[in-house]
Amino acid sequence: MAMKRAIGLMSGTSLDGIDVALIESDGERIRLVKSANGLVAPLGPTGYRGYAEAERALLREATRDAEGLRARTDRPGRLAEAEDFVARAHAEAIEAFLAQNDLRPEDIDVVGFHGQTVIHRPKLGLTVQLGDGAALAKRLGIRVVSDMRANDVAQGGQGAPLVPVFHKALAEAAGFTGPLGILNIGGLANATLIDSGGNMLAFDTGPGNGPINDWMKERTGQDFDEGGATAARGTVDEDLLENLLGHPLILRAPPKSLDRNWFSHRLAGYLTVEDGAVTLTAFTAHAVARSLAFASERPARWIVGGGGAKNRTLMVMLERLLAAEVLNADAIGWSSDFLEAQAFAYLALRSLEGLPLTYPTTTGVAAPVTGGIVSEP
């Protein structure tokens, strides 16, 4: 199959903003260049559109309004307003990206549009990512693939994580072999484990940055714990940590996809700012470590992406608990900030080719299935 250009979009549950990334792929192979020192050159240009505080507030309110949803098409409260905003903001992000990189709509074969998750309840057969793919395609003049989780959930899968098939393809293109762990730490944390035979197991491990960010916002007004500096000054409350790690969703075996809102920062409410930050950080790290009970082989190397890769306190904890080499994705030429956006570009290309997005070992679906709704401009 011929290589195509795809743009991926990701707006995560941390509500920071919209990541934009361009890759070239045929839905299986990824165009990747290794430099003389063995690092991977960037897959393609990237961009970002941050959310203003009022925009974050709208998305937070829409997420609360979604708690009572029973049908995917219902839009009570501010959900309809938020859905219009999501499509508009993503269009603005791509338009700015194209202009900055001297690209035209006809240079792009497809856009992979994740949308904004407001509720994810696979046991109820319910997952909702706000964002009108048809409206986005019409405004941009580019084919759009959206709603990539729904088919997996309809077929009995967990609907998440979706990025493992991209992780595996990227690792293979970069020459990495198992046993390898690829960890993405956004609002939640999810792991892709590749054993020495190339077999893949993937699942959400537990909280990521979500509870830490919520804690910092509530207690300090800051959006996150920059570099893990606040946590570095604190002392872990071991009793609270053990209580948090007893959460039934942490103990549950894969397949496992989680909802960011299932892990609250408020259990740390009686602690100092520093002690709360470090205890919630330890919760994320220990949940990853305990997930290895489900692995056929312990990874000898971990590659960490997402916002959590910038939290030095968290990275030190992971290195100690995992007893393995732990690398920031940026250190090997990958992009810790844009891995998910790149993944949704890749998934959009797979969707166009009818290739599987999910597998029994990633979401628990009975057989590999494709997904996504294709909207023509």
Curated annotation (Swiss-Prot):
GO terms for molecular function: ATP binding; kinase activity; phosphotransferase activity, alcohol group as acceptor. The lineage of its organism: Bacteria, Pseudomonadati, Pseudomonadota, Alphaproteobacteria, Hyphomicrobiales. Pathway: Amino-sugar metabolism; 1,6-anhydro-N-acetylmuramate degradation; Cell wall biogenesis; peptidoglycan recycling. This is Anhydro-N-acetylmuramic acid kinase. It holds the Pfam family AnmK. InterPro entries: Anhydro_N_Ac-Mur_kinase, ATPase_NBD. Keywords: ATP-binding, Carbohydrate metabolism, Kinase, Nucleotide-binding, Transferase. It catalyses: 1,6-anhydro-N-acetyl-beta-muramate + ATP + H2O = N-acetyl-D-muramate 6-phosphate + ADP + H(+). ATP binds at G12, T13, S14, L15, D16, G17, I18, D19. The gene is anmK. Its EC number is 2.7.1.170. Catalyzes the specific phosphorylation of 1,6-anhydro-N-acetylmuramic acid (anhMurNAc) with the simultaneous cleavage of the 1,6-anhydro ring, generating MurNAc-6-P. Is required for the utilization of anhMurNAc either imported from the medium or derived from its own cell wall murein, and thus plays a role in cell wall recycling. It is an enzyme of class 2 (transferase). Belongs to the anhydro-N-acetylmuramic acid kinase family. The keyword Phosphoprotein does not apply.
